[in-house]
């Protein structure tokens, strides 16, 4: 299983629509950088956010998630409260090939400010926007800039196609659009 380089990412993104929209260059002046890098792709966070709140004093339960736990926000700058959490989504829509697994890591620009980004792996044949988990670990409010970089995706190509892909098993987040809250298959 090898890490894929910029030429491969471009070859998969443009003719095969693996990443839409696709930025062929790294954009980094006066913004948190995004676009193609040497061995990855820096994804952007959209302007849609769900910010966790304790106003309704409910319990966060992944098996029975209460939407009262979050407040919807749309804007160019999202302020994540101290020691709090927000969900967002990528600007980019992904179509992962059957022989590829993608792993996402937070950007150092945000990490150095105490903002931790978590995204689970993009499984083979996953398709959709990526829901991004953003944690503000600081005792201060933190700014997240919409339409700028938030994390980097690394693409790992297997030696052969997997037996069962995310699409084959009808993954619960397949073809998700917007920010998708926790789901449990029943």
Curated annotation (Swiss-Prot):
InterPro entries: dCTP_deaminase (IPR011962), dUTPase-like_sf (IPR036157), dUTPase_trimeric (IPR033704). The keyword Repeat does not apply. GO terms for biological process: dUMP biosynthetic process; dUTP biosynthetic process; nucleobase-containing small molecule interconversion. Homotrimer. Pfam families: DCD (PF22769). Pathway: Pyrimidine metabolism; dUMP biosynthesis; dUMP from dCTP (dUTP route): step 1/2. Keywords: Hydrolase, Nucleotide metabolism, Nucleotide-binding. Catalyzes the deamination of dCTP to dUTP. This is dCTP deaminase. The keyword Hydrolase applies. It catalyses: dCTP + H2O + H(+) = dUTP + NH4(+). DCTP binds at residues 107-112, 152, 166, 175-176. The active site is at 133 (proton donor/acceptor). PANTHER family: DCTP DEAMINASE (PTHR42680:SF3). Its EC number is 3.5.4.13. Belongs to the dCTP deaminase family. GO terms for molecular function: dCTP deaminase activity; nucleotide binding.
């Amino acid at each position: 299983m090898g890490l894929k380089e910029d030429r491969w990412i471009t070859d998969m993104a443009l003719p095969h629509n693996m990443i839409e929209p696709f930025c062929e260059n790294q954009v980094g002046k006066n913004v948190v950088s995004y676009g193609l890098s040497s061995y990855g792709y820096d994804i952007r966070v959209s302007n849609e956010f769900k910010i966790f709140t304790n106003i309704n004093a409910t319990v966060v339960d992944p098996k029975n998630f209460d939407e009262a736990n979050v407040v919807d926000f749309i804007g160019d700058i999202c302020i994540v409260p101290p020691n709090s959490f927000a969900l967002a989504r990528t600007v980019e829509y992904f179509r992962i090939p059957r022989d590829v697994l993608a792993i996402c890591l937070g950007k150092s620009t945000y990490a150095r400010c105490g903002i931790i980004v978590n995204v689970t792996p993009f499984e083979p044949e996953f398709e959709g926007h990526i829901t991004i988990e953003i944690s503000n670990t600081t005792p201060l409010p933190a700014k997240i800039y919409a339409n700028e970089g938030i994390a980097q995706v690394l693409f790992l190509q297997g030696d052969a196609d997997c037996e069962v892909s995310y699409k084959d098993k009808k993954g619960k987040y397949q073809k998700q659009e917007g920010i998708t809250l926790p789901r449990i298959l029943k």
